[in-house]
Amino acid sequence: MQRSPLEKASVVSKLFFSWTRPILKKGYRQRLELSDIYQIPSADSADNLSEKLEREWDRELASKKNPKLINALRRCFFWRFMFYGIFLYLGEVTKAVQPLLLGRIIASYDPDNKEERSIAIYLGIGLCLLFIVRTLLLHPAIFGLHHIGMQMRIAMFSLIYKKTLKLSSRVLDKISIGQLVSLLSNNLNKFDEGLALAHFVWIAPLQVALLMGLIWELLQASAFCGLGFLIVLALFQAGLGRMMMKYRDQRAGKINERLVITSEMIENIQSVKAYCWEEAMEKMIENLRQTELKLTRKAAYVRYFNSSAFFFSGFFVVFLSVLPYALIKGIVLRKIFTTISFCIVLRMAVTRQFPWAVQTWYDSLGAINKIQDFLQKQEYKTLEYNLTTTEVVMENVTAFWEEGFGELFEKAKQNNNNRETSNGDDSLFFSNFSLLGTPVLKDINFKIERGQLLAVAGSTGAGKTSLLMMIMGELEPSEGKIKHSGRISFCSQFSWIMPGTIKENIIFGVSYDEYRYRSVIKACQLEEDISKFAEKDNIVLGEGGITLSGGQRARISLARAVYKDADLYLLDSPFGYLDVLTEKEIFESCVCKLMANKTRILVTSKMEHLKKADKILILHEGSSYFYGTFSELQNLRPDFSSKLMGCDSFDQFSAERRNSILTETLRRFSLEGDAPVSWTETKKQPFKQTGEFGEKRKNSILNPINSIRKFSIVQKTPLQMNGIEEDSDEPFERRVSLVPDSEQGEAILPRISVISTGPMLQARRRQSVLNLMTQSVNQGQNIHRKTTASTRKVSLAPQANLTELDIYSRRLSQETGLEISEEINEEDLKECFFDDMESIPAVTTWNTYLRYITVHKSLIFVLIWCLVIFLAEVAASLVVLWLLGNTPLQDKGNSTHSRNNSYAVIITSTSSYYVFYIYVGVADTLLAMGFFRGLPLVHTLITVSKILHNKMLHSVLQAPMSTLNTLKAGGILNRFSKDIAILDDLLPLTIFDFIQLLLIVIGAIAVVAVLQPYIFVATVPVIVAFIMLRAYFLQTSQQLKQLESEGRSPIFTHLVTSLKGLWTLRAFGRQPYFETLFHKALNLHTANWFLYLSTLRWFQMRIEMIFVIFFIAVTFISILTTGEGEGRVGIILTLAMNIMSTLQWAVNSSIDVDSLMRSVSRVFKFIDMPTEGKPTKSTKPYKNGQLSKLMIIENSHVKKDDIWPSGGQMTVKDLTAKYTEGGNAILENISFSISPGQRVGLLGRTGSGKSTLLSAFLRLLNTEGEIQIDGVSWDSITLQQWRKAFGVIPQKVFIFSGTFRKNLDPYEQWSDQEIWKVADEVGLRSVIEQFPGKLDFVLVDGGCVLSHGHKQLMCLARSVLSKAKILLLDEPSAHLDPVTYQIIRRTLKQAFADCTVILCEHRIEAMLECQQFLVIEENKVRQYDSIQKLLNERSLFQQAISPSDRVKLFPHRNSSKCKSKPQIAALKEETEEEVQDTRL
């Protein structure tokens, strides 16, 4: 960034904003880059502002019991705020004084007042000087107030972020990510531009008092008729506003429903295509859109009448003010024109400025109170540590996640002790206490010495992660003691990657040690992966590490934990995404050797890990089931395997027992409560703890079903922040509505507006921040994975010796603290955060306007209708002026002289009542035409919006994955949220306002041209100057606005990234580092926003200066050319003032239209996306001689012998796959064939391309080569027909918001009996029956009430219903509880017994049921053989399989002389050694 010219600018340059000229010139000539933007003044830096406000807030907290944030803000900003307010008031006063001088100028032309004629020229000079003074006062004042508003926003942004990093996990569990984003976006945006309006709460009443005094002097009591009308009008507008709010609140729920479904569709677009659900999703979203648009139209009509009322009120205010006076004393032209000028100012003060100011104060105080409540929430308490401690001790520790349960626990325990029970057994106490709430950890004891490895095991929900959280201080123990040194390193269960390079992710702000870094890289098996990237470890990873495989992310997270020098290393299931060989190598080299002298706590379920551990702790339902060594475990707890894995062999249970297990599993994985809430219920969640969900928590204590909920790290659908134009797995907008929260939707929507957290099962059932932190980012990454993704190759060579690691291990054990580095590479920050600028022009092209107008045929006729009405209005205005100009002057006392062909100054009441009749008739006509001329326009523009939305939706659903892979999910969602909201709400009325203002200006110019041709000559160059200035400014302003919009993304991205990794941040003590990063992101945004505000003020000031020059010319031309006794000067000066103020408004409105039309350009860009390919080859003869097109009919999911596919035979020839056109090949020359009904397992290391191959089968990638199913080539049929041949269980489970029935059968092809039959078959019946409404129960939020296992069963049921002959399974057992895993295995054997199954899996047990194995290595097929051959050869499979698995496969190999074919059967009862959760 460049140094700002503002620093060296002179006072004059600052006053006229001339220092912005270089950036305006550059923006006009070329495209602006981030490097062209000026640095912010030091006074605006986030560091300075946040420190200033934080100091005052701390002072407020320390000095008062009831601290007020507004007091802290007042001490920081009040005096500057009032200073600019006084300037603003003085500028407004000049508006009130101008009509006085105008009246004196008109009066000087009264034939009876000749002595004033000589001072007319001086009055003209005075009038012009007032305009100059107003310009010099108003613009610096408005800019100064905007500047203060910006500083307040920055300071509060920073304060909220710092507080977020300090919040306790219990508080985070109650706050949704939507609420946090809402706090930052909706509430704080009110300060940016609203602060300039705040002063009108006192300026407007003073202005009205001054104006009424001046009008009283002119018209006496009749002045109050006009004021009365304005007050009635303001009340009418307030009523319309309330009505509009009612419609908008109703519509918010509908918009939310549509956006929830749309975001689910976008993030799961690969699954939608795989299931062939494009038409179903399109129809579903269009139906929701239809109901939404009905309310949109109602709200638009109300807003239209509100806007029209303002435009046409001016006519009647003047009429009602002058009428009573004129009837009594006659018409005085001087007074009419002066009154018109006064009423223009009065109308603005009463109907616009004051109501807006009141609304601004109401919104701002509400926002400040919300932030104040947030800033007083409970903070995370760091435990008291003793740095000299070498051991880790936990004594009698009990803990609850639910806030308040700890206090209840203490009271209950105290009561229990008071009873003095004779047996002294605590079991009675705990069983009674379960009614209040089950502790997540109960009476835990262990002690480990320095350098020991403690393995923690247990089934899902046993409390393993909670134990680590308690050691880190995230979970506060209700009783008991924890003792350790406090120097902790942590590796999360779900890998967390921050935006930045691989190196920055591993070093994580700690000072760099080359030897240490290289040793860690080697131990974590990252050397080979890093070598694949051109930039090596300096490659920039996007948010969530989207370009990496799950295994690569897991190893980077582990490397980060190991790189930090700590006394205690907490490793929470770090090997979940690794193949068995990599896991084994890392466990040996890293955990056992590299960290040999460090204390380690490893959460695991692997038998080999337990054997190597010094101590083992097995948790069961929060209690310590066993603590000791492995040999003690085998002797004392022979049943430990079932506790370790969660259940016994599922197949051995009766149907009733299975159902009870499923029911219990459902309860454990659900969140509390069972009362359904209507789909449209969308309530704003308050931040106060006494809110709705707070009450439900209190009630839940008495509900035994709710109280058994434990804190369990359950894999739910991943969540992320995408409306922020950043990509990851899942945009957070699914939980968050993007409905505008105020009329200024254009300002709010780009900042990710939030109105509610979406429809939910219950208030508690939403995605809290805590859920966000405990969710995996690893699911379904193949849809996004770029060609740069590393592909690890399977190395069969022995590993190098680890002597270097031995050396480093000793270095790591030394008590040397490393320095913390806070340096941040700003270039990397920009690269991480800023997208490439959109490929649409800086200024909207004429082609876009033309295309927009022609979307709907009737729009052209509506525009012609508006023009006809306008011509009628101009004609009516000329009639009124003709009446005023040609009514003869009659004096009551003397009628001997009259002046023909002249403009009379006085008209008596007795002779000219007919003037008023005509005037009233014309006024009524204007009102009727004015009110209703815009309605057809608004109606038609909303219809255009509907058409564009439907076209865009169709284009996205039909676009190829190669195109969608290049787009970010947040970017797509923004088109459907922000841009469609602009097309619905802002664009129709902005276009109406612009057309209205333009026609008013043209009409006024036409009237002036008739009266005074000289003025018309002066008007032409002014209009040309306006157009040229607009074109010059627009080029730069639109680019700056775009840069500012893009600069907003990193702020919210960084917030969500920080929340996802909050436990890691705290464990590493990196809060200051991330605060610095956040301030950098804020400063980047501030630089763009400040420059935009400055250039906007430059433009507004130049427009004002042109107007002043024009008015000076008009004033002197009028004064010097008007003859004696003529009142024409009044009409000319009044119209000139009206022309220029309206023209300024029109120019600004045209800029708004151009800015909003960029949304239309973006929508058109999406509409023009390519569609998925159609068949390219002609139909080929089938094997039996018939034409393939006769065999290939639309698969109606009915099994008949003559319908393709019948057998499921599959032949693959020379298959090559790429993610994007022209990209690197992910798979090359893959060839193999599968017999009907055969089961094939895909083998390969993490990132080798197994999931990619499954995507290629479905034609979701750019592919070359050929695949045939039962002899039919994929080139000879449609994509829909081809994909319907497959049943799919994807890695990323897709549950959209809708009923169970809709989720299983979106096309509504099957009866309830058939759906229930399939549900029973896959074990879903008992799950569905638990919910009210059963099949009609509405699932929301990605099916958050279901466990990951139940979601997998839903996918399985879909595949059974599809009756497909080929089944593709992509790691179906990932994150499954053992119960669901057993169900899936059983269903595959029963329901798909005669189907071809292609399985990509990490569990060996599942792979053993495959007859053939396809080994993928270095993008190619390395082996394709049966189990027997792979076991005999040196292969990946041979290395992964254990001796016990071989015995299971070939039980008779040693006893039988004759080798028979192996029988693939279900696993029998598992022994202790076989229960391991081994992964390939």
From Swiss-Prot:
Q: Indicate where this protein is primarily found.
A: membrane
Q: Where is this region: Disordered?
A: 1452-1480
Outline the extent of the ABC transporter domain.
423-646, 1210-1443
Report whether Transmembrane shows up as a keyword of the record: yes
Q: Which residues lie on this side of the membrane: Extracellular?
A: 99-122, 217-222, 320-339, 880-918, 1012-1013, 1117-1130
Enzyme Commission number, as recorded: 5.6.1.6
List the stretches on the Cytoplasmic face of the membrane: 1-77, 147-195, 244-298, 359-858, 940-990, 1035-1095, 1152-1480
| Keywords on record | ATP-binding, Cell membrane, Chloride, Chloride channel, Endoplasmic reticulum, Endosome, Glycoprotein, Ion channel, Ion transport, Isomerase, Isopeptide bond, Lipoprotein, Membrane, Nucleotide-binding, Nucleus, Palmitate, Phosphoprotein, Repeat, Transmembrane, Transmembrane helix, Transport, Ubl conjugation
What the entry lists under SUPFAM superfamilies is as follows: ABC transporter transmembrane region (SSF90123), P-loop containing nucleoside triphosphate hydrolases (SSF52540)
Query: Posttranslational modification, per the record?
Result: N-glycosylated.
Pfam families in UniProt: ABC_membrane, ABC_tran, CFTR_R
Where is this chain compositionally biased, Acidic residues type?
1470-1480
Q: Which residues carry this modification: Phosphothreonine?
A: 717
Residue ranges annotated for the ABC transmembrane type-1 domain, each copy included: 81-365, 859-1155
What family does this belong to? Answer: Belongs to the ABC transporter superfamily. ABCC family. CFTR transporter (TC 3.A.1.202) subfamily.
Q: How does it assemble?
A: Monomer; does not require oligomerization for channel activity. May form oligomers in the membrane. Interacts with SLC26A3, SLC26A6 and NHERF1. Interacts with SHANK2. Interacts with MYO6. Interacts (via C-terminus) with GOPC (via PDZ domain); this promotes CFTR internalization and thereby decreases channel activity. Interacts with SLC4A7 through NHERF1. Found in a complex with MYO5B and RAB11A. Interacts with ANO1. Interacts with SLC26A8. Interacts with AHCYL1; the interaction increases CFTR activity. Interacts with CSE1L.
Name of the molecule in the record: Cystic fibrosis transmembrane conductance regulator
